[in-house]
Amino acid sequence: MTNKKYHTTLLFYLAAFFLPVLIMIGVLYSQKIYPGSERTILTSDGFHQYVIFATGLRNILHGDGSLFYTFTSGLGLNFYALTSYYLGSFLSPLYYFFTVNQMADAFYYITLLKFGLIGLSGAFSFKRLFTKVSRSFILCLSTGFALMSFATSQLEINTWLDAFILAPLIILGLHLLLRFNRRGLYFFSLTCLFIQNYYFGYMMAIFLTLYTIVQLITIKGWKSKILHFIDFGIVSILAGLSSAVMLLPTLLDLTTHGEKFTGASSLLTESTYYFDFFAKNLVGVYDTTKFGSIPMIYVGILPLILFLLFFISREIKLSLRLGYLLLVAFFIASFYLQPLDLFWQGMHAPNMFLHRYSWLLSLLTVLLAGETLNRIRKFSFKRLLLSFLGLSTAYLLTWIFQSHYSFIEPVSWLLSIAFLLAYAILFTSYFRQQIPGSVFRCFTFLFCIFELALSTYYVVGALGNEWVFPTREGYLRNMSAITKLVSKTKQANKTFYRTERLEAQTGNDSMKFNYNGISQFSSIRNTASSSTLDRLGFKSEGTNLNLRYQNNTIIADSLFGIKYNLSNFDLNKYGFNHVTSEKTMGLYQNNNASQLAILTDGIYNNIDFTVNTLDNQTSLLNTLSGLNSTYFKRAPSQLFDKDAKSLNQRVAKNVSNSNKDFVTITYQVIAPPHSQLYVSIPNISWSDDNNHSLSITVNGVTKNQVTDNTFDFFDLGYFETESMVTIKLSFPGNKAISFDNPSFYALDTQNYQIAMDTINERDSKVTTSKNKVFVDYSSKTNASLFFTIPYDKGWTATINHKKVKIQRAQKGFMKVDVPSGKGKVVLTFIPYGLKTGSLISLLASIIFCCYAYFIRKTTIIQKS
C-alpha cells in the first residue's frame, strides 16, 4: 500500500468514526450536555438502571464485590445474568477508570465511543460488501446506520449500541462465508454478539436465517444452495454453542426466575396505520418510546430512495428482488401483527421501548441501498425518477392522513421535502451529465450528512422533551452524605447486614450507593423471591419488574436484616436509634435486625401464606421464633372531617369549589401503649393522575410518603403510652380524592421484642466475601438455617467441609438443615450452568476450528 493510499484509507476510517461522534457531540451540546455540564445524558432507564448497574460493575472491578453475585439488589442477585442483559459490552470495563461521581460523564464518553464504532464497523464492512461504491457514499451509509433513529431515540440504553457495532461485521462475515468459504469473521462476530447481548443476538439469528435464504437465490444450483445453507447452519450453531459460557447460565436463570411467555392479546398491534413506514422515514420524526409507539426505522432519505430503487430496477434479478420484498413484507407484517411482533422479541412483551427488532429493517434498508449503489451506473434515469416519484407520493399520502400522525411536526415535512428535492436535483443532474461525478458525490455527501445531523438534533430534542435529561445535581443528590454514612456502617460491622433508604430516588438506590438492600428495578430478577416478598409487604406485583422496600413494618425490617435506615426525616420507629447524620441525611440503627441466616428451633417447615400481609408476617415470625404470639390488632379510629363523605365503604372529598389547593382529610386514632402505628389506605383514586403525592401529619409532624410502586401502607410512628392521635392525610395537587375506608393497625412492640430476642439470642454469625457466605452456628438440637437469600440453583453448601443440600424455603428463600453442636456452613455461588457452558464453549470453538480446517483442506484438494 502506497503512502498516499494509506493516508486516504486512514482518513476514510477516521471520518467514518468521527462523523457520528461529532454530530452526537453537537446535538448533545444543543441539549446543554457535555463533560461536566449541569445536565446529563442519563434520561429514562439510563438514570434508573443502566448507569447504576455500570456503577455496580465499576465497584466490583475495584474489588468491592463479585462478578457472579451481588447483595446490593433484591436481597441478592445473579450479577452474571444481569451483566448479560445490561452490561454485555466489551467496553464496559472502561467504567473502571472513572470515580462514582464521574459515572454520568463516563456514560457520556462511552456512548459517544459506541456511536463512533458503529460508524467505523459500518464503513469497514460496507466498503468490502459494495466494492464499486465510492467512499463518500459508503460514509453516507455508515453514518446513516450509526445515527438511525432507533439508536438516537434510545441512546440512553447504550448497551444496545454494541449490537449495532457487530451487525455490519456479521453481515460481512456471512457474505465471506457464502461467497468465498471464509468462516472466521462470521463465527467470531456472531459469537461476540451472543456473548454481549443474547436478546439482540436472538433477533439477529432470526434475521440471518431469513437473509441467508434470500442470499441463496444468487447461488447457482440446488446442490450448491443446500450445501451453503448447511454450512451457514453449522457455523451459526457452533457460534451459538461457543457463546454458551454466557448463554447457558443466562438461559437457565431466565427459565428458572424469569417471567412467563406473553400471549397475544389481540391480532393487531396498537397505534398502527397504513403509512407508518413512510411516516417514520421523515426527517427528525419521534413519537414516543413509551407505550403506543410505532417502529423507529429512519436511516436517512438517501438510503430510502436507493432502497426503493432496488425493487424497481430491472438490472437486478427479479427472483432476488422478490425475495427481499418478501423479507421486507415480513418485517412490516411484524409491526402490525402482535404474534409476529412478540416472536421477534422472544415472546415477551417489552415494558416500553417497543418493536425492539425494528433496527434490523434499518440495517436491511442500508444493505439494499448499498446493493443499488453498487449498480448505480447501470440504472436507467426513468427508474430513478420513478423511485423519487414513488417516495413523493408516499409522503403526500402520509400528509393527507396526518390526523393519524399527530406527532409529526411541520419542520419534519419541510425538511423531508427539501432534502428529497435536493437529492432529486443532484441525481437528475448527474444522470443527464450536467455535473461531474466528483461534484455529484461531494454535494450528495454533504446534504446526506447535514440531513442526518438535523434529524438527530430533532429526535434527541424530542427524547429530552418526553423523558427530560436530568441534572447532574439531581443524579448526585445526597451522594456524598450517603457514601460517608454507608462507609461508617461498614467500618462498624463485621457480620452481614442490610441498609435501606426511606425516601428512595430510584428502585436501585442500594446498588447506586453500594449497600446491601432489598429494592430492585430490573428485567433480570428472581421472580420467586420477589413474589414471596410481595406477600410479606415488599411490593412486587405482576411480572416482578419492580420490588420496593418502602411502606412495610418493623417485623419485615428485622427478619430481613435491615440494620440501618437512611432518612431525611426524624425516624420514629421502635428499636431504631439515631446514630449520626451527614447534612440532612440521618442514619438510624435497628437494634433487632437478624442475621442473614436465622437459626431456627428445630427443623424449619414451610408455612402457607395468604393474601393478608400482616397475617403472613405474624406466621413467619412465630415459625422462626417458635412462639405463638399475636402482634397486630386494629386501632380504634374516627373520621374527624365534616367535609369528607363516607359512603359504601369509601371515603371521598372534593375541594374544587373552595379556595383550598388540595384535599386534606383528618382522622383521630387511639394508639395503644407500646405500639407501632400503621395505616392502610387502599385503592386511592387521584384527581390528578400525574401527581400521586401524599403527606401524613401525626400530631403536628408532617412527613412525605412514598406511593410509587409501593403498598398504600404507611408508618405513623411509635407510641410508648396510650395516646389520642390526630392524623391528617394531605394530597398535594389533588382537589378530589377517594379511597376505601382506611384501617389503622397497632403492632404490639412488647410481643415483637420477645420474638426478636428469641431469634437473635441463638448463636448464628454470618459474614460474606465475594460470592461466598460463611455461617458459624451453635445449636443444642438439629435445626435449620433460614437464609433470607433468593433461592437459586447456583448456590452450593457445605457443613464442616461436607457438601449438603440446599432446600427451598417459602418458595423464594433457602434453608440448610444443620446437626446439633457447633458447625461452619459455607455457601458458594457459581452461576448455574457456567461450568457446563464453559465446557460447551471450549468444545464448540475446537470443533469450529477443526471444521473450518477440514473444509479448507477439502477445497484445496478439490481445486488441485
Show which residues each predicted segment covers.
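Active-site-proximal, structured, solvent-exposed surfaces of multi-pass membrane proteins
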Residues: 2-4, 639-864
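Membrane-embedded helix bundles of polyisoprenyl
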Residues: 21, 111, 115-128, 134-178, ...
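Periplasmic/ER-lumenal interhelical loops and adjacent helix-loop junctions
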Residues: 44, 48-49, 55, 229-231, ...
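Start-transfer (signal-anchor) and selected internal transmembrane alpha helices
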Residues: 1-31, 443-444, 846-864
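Membrane-interface micro-motifs in multi-pass membrane enzymes
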Residues: 80-85, 104-117, 137-138, 144-168, ...
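Extracytoplasmic/lumenal acceptor-recognition loop(s) of multi-pass membrane glycoenzymes
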Residues: 450-468, 488-556, 594, 599-610, ...
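Contiguous transmembrane helix-bundle modules in multi-pass membrane proteins
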Residues: 200, 326, 348, 354-478, ...
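Membrane-interface coil-to-helix junctions
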Residues: 10-13, 20-122, 143-164, 203, ...
